[in-house]
Curated annotation (Swiss-Prot):
PROSITE patterns (alphabetical): TPR, TPR_REGION
Residue runs in coiled coils: none
SUPFAM superfamilies noted in UniProt: TPR-like
Compositionally biased residues, Polar residues: 180-199, 375-387
Subcellular location(s) of the protein: Nucleus
Protein name: Cell division cycle protein 27 homolog B
Repeat in keyword set: yes
Record PANTHER family: CELL DIVISION CYCLE 16,23,27, CELL DIVISION CYCLE PROTEIN 27 HOMOLOG
Length: 744
């Protein structure tokens, strides 16, 4: 009965019927109370977004898997201290972190959100050491600015580590099959009730999977030894389905409960037969469905944090290893070379209906076919034992793969991750042009995906190339219309381009897609902000913060709106909240610097602009305002150096050139200032402030005709009301010397 209930719960979790899983698991715990069964119930609660239920259920438990699930529920409830205590018990200072790479990853997140960046980086690195394919850990290192080069992380050491794990599984499977073959050859009786003992079963399991306490439902029940042997003994059929599965690498950060439990599920009485004649291998799901499910789970590129951390453990179906085609030199495979051409629209549109499952089947690892019509297990193991090491196979994601195929697959996966990882690292270091060049090295089928195109859009956004950023994000929407990754930045791009209609349409689409995602409300807030309805915009940004308090950009957008409304106190609080979430969020440092600059607290302003500059040393906007602060502090020579750097960083940005001219005017270097302004007129021909400053220079040089001409040109360009008043005042006092004009 117990094994049947466990099987029912696992099936419900696999098919996302969480209500049934919870109900049946409650029956399981009532009939067979044990901590292992509580873990399965807690997993069901977590899948159903009931972290509070899992929290109360597991509080006080001691098994490693229970501690991990309890820490996960605490993390989702923002009880970070309790989560840390569960993973690192105070009374057991040398205790191993449960669940290997996933446990270290969770602990790293806890350290990150409690402002212990060095400890967080150590945990993320440790998780990558255990599982080099845990991409989420490497991305967190990039966010922290502590990532090593991708070639080092996803290099030969990582390849050897992964191959070693798979080879261990291969040798274990061969040993288990040989053992079963020997038993079958020496048996002369019906041995269906004489399966090997639970002690032997435990020994075999410990070689087949890493020892994670609490993952196996092998506890005793008052029901007779012979009956329990059916539940605890992994038959050869079950061994092929799950006992030889890859080690629990936790690539999707899933609680490792459901998959190990399949040891019981697969070895239930339904699959237990006379050991001298094994039935053909049965599958819970046919091969095509397995591929579709694994493909869908793997391609989900933008889950929210809560759903990522509580990813469905019941659907722990290992994805098939996909090969990555080599780089093609034809530049047309990308979206228009270094720029995004109009051809990309057709390219992505054609791929829009392309099935990920078909892509994996057509272009994935072509190992031995997964043939359900194989002979019985005993004969299969006999033939395997007679083959060379190269012909020895194991089942990965429902596909039989040889050791040679595994080696090739690992190499191809790591080659792909090296390119993606290096692009990600460069992006978070704000070396955006280098990041774009790196992403261009990807095969076209990976470049034309939502995640990569969003990263490309972010890179163009940081380069203040809003037109190219808009193209990239638009193509990302076409490739993955369901993905919200980067859509908050996309809405800001449309805000800067003043694309009112596009922004409104995007906001409505995002709200209809997921109204519980912070990106949706950020887009809505930007839409209202563009319409100058700052109070409504602020309400939308606050809603985004409410949905995800760890979304730093939402806090920053709140700060921008508070600053626009001249509520500097709340603006500073919002920026500080953003920095608590992400200390490298340079936008928040920049926002604080702007507030202090407007309050004429120049030392504070210079400090915050410098902090932003240290994080993003390639931003011409940050350099411009840093130079402005230095000039206000009478450090004009330093300010000029910074302005020169800003001009070199972005020739299209008129702000540093204008500020440089202002500084030169203050230093009485009028001829140099005029040269800068004449050059600036070519980049910003309709900027009224440029002509107004030229008018002031000509007035100082007593060239009144030219001064009047430039003041008039400035007025013709319809400047803001405050500038109009200043220009008219300068025109009225045209013949008054500056010394008299500036006297009190």
């Amino acid at each position: 009965m117990e094994a049947m209930l466990v099987d029912c719960v696992n099936n419900s979790l696999r098919h996302f019927v969480y209500k049934n899983a919870i109900f049946m698991c409650e029956r399981l715990c009532a009939e067979f109370p044990s901590e292992v069964n509580l873990q399965l119930l807690a997993t069901s609660y977590l899948q159903n977004n009931q972290a509070y239920s899992a929290y109360h259920l597991l509080k006080g438990t001691q098994m490693a898997q229970s501690r991990y699930l309890f820490a996960l529920s605490c993390f989702q409830m923002d009880l970070l201290n309790e989560a840390e205590s569960a993973l690192c018990p105070v009374n057991e200072p040398g205790a191993e972190i449960p669940n290997g790479a996933a446990g270290h990853y969770l602990l790293g997140l806890i350290y990150k959100y409690t402002d212990r960046r060095k400890n967080a980086a150590q945990q993320f690195k440790q998780s990558l050491t255990i599982d080099p394919l845990l991409w989420a850990a490497y991305e967190e290192l990039c966010i922290l600015g502590a990532a090593e080069e991708a070639t080092a992380v996803f290099g030969e050491t990582a390849a050897l580590s992964i191959q070693k794990q798979y080879m261990q599984q291969l040798s274990t499977s061969l040993g288990l099959n040989t053992y079963n073959e020997e038993r079958n050859s020496t048996s002369t009786k019906n041995t269906s009730s004489e399966d090997y003992s639970p002690r032997q079963s435990k020994h075999t399991q410990s070689h087949g999977l890493k020892d994670i306490s609490g993952n196996f439902h092998s506890h005793g029940v008052n029901g007779g030894v012979s009956n329990m042997s059916f539940y605890n003994t992994p038959s050869p059929v079950a061994a092929q389905l799950s006992g030889i599965a890859p080690p629990p690498l936790f690539r999707n950060f899933q609680p490792a409960v459901a998959n190990p439990n399949s040891l019981i599920t697969d070895s239930s009485p339904k699959s237990t037969v006379n050991s001298t004649l094994q039935a053909p291998r049965r599958k819970f799901v046919d091969e095509g469905k397995l591929r579709k499910i694994s493909g869908r789970l793997f391609s989900d590129s933008g889950p929210r944090r809560s759903s990522r951390l509580s990813a469905d453990s019941g659907a722990n179906i290992n994805s098939s290893v996909a090969t990555v085609s080599g780089n093609v030199n034809n530049a047309s495979k990308y979206l228009g070379g270094s720029k995004l051409s109009s051809l990309a629209l057709r390219s992505v549109t054609l791929r829009k209906g392309h099935s990920w499952a078909n892509e994996n089947m057509d272009e994935g690892v072509r190992g031995e076919p997964f043939d359900d019509s194989r002979p019985n297990t005993a004969s299969t193991t006999g033939s395997m034992a007679s083959n060379d090491q190269e012909d020895e196979t194991m089942s990965i994601g429902g596909i039989a793969m040889s050791s040679q195929t595994i080696t090739i697959g690992v190499s191809e996966i790591l080659n792909l991750l090296r390119t993606l990882g290096e692009g990600c690292r460069l992006s978070y270091m704000y070396r955006c042009q280098e990041a774009l060049d790196t992403y261009m090295k990807l095969p076209h089928k990976h470049y034309n995906t939502g995640w990569v195109l969003s990263q490309v859009g972010k890179a163009y956004f940081e380069l203040i190339d809003y037109l190219e950023a808009e193209k990239a994000f638009r193509l990302a929407r076409l490739a993955s219309p369901y993905c919200l990754e980067g859509m908050d930045i996309y809405s800001t791009v449309l805000y800067h381009l003043k694309e009112d209609m596009k922004l409104s349409y995007l906001a409505q689409e995002l709200i209809s897609t997921d109204r519980l995602a912070p990106q949706s409300w950020c887009a809505m807030g930007n839409c209202y902000s563009l319409q100058k309805d700052h109070e409504t915009a602020l309400k939308n940004f606050l809603r985004a913060v409410q949905l995800n308090p760890r979304f730093a950009y939402a806090h920053t957008l709140c700060g921008h709106e508070y600053t626009t409304l001249e509520d500097f106190e709340n603006g500073m609080k919002s920026y500080q909240n953003a920095l608590r979430v992400d200390t490298r969020h340079y936008n928040a440092w920049y926002g604080l610097g702007m507030i202090y600059l407007r309050q004429e607290k120049l030392e504070f302003s210079e400090h915050h602009f410098r902090m932003a500059f240290l994080i993003n040393p390639s931003s011409s906007v940050i350099m411009s305002y840093l130079g402005t602060s230095l000039h206000a502090l009478k450090r004009s020579e330093e300010a000029l150096e910074i302005m020169e750097q800003a001009i070199v960083a972005d020739r299209k940005n008129p702000l540093p050139m204008y500020q440089k001219a202002n500084i030169l005017v203050c230093l009485e270097r009028l001829d140099e200032a005029l040269e800068v302004l004449e050059e600036l007129k070519e980049y910003a021909p309709s900027e009224s402030s440029v002509y107004a400053l030229m008018g002031r220079i000509y007035k100082r040089r007593n060239m009144h005709d030219k001064a009047m001409l430039h003041f008039g040109l400035a007025l013709d360009m319809k400047p803001p009301a405050t500038d109009v008043a200043a220009i008219k005042a300068a025109m009225e006092k045209l013949h008054v010397p500056d010394e008299i004009d500036e006297s009190p």
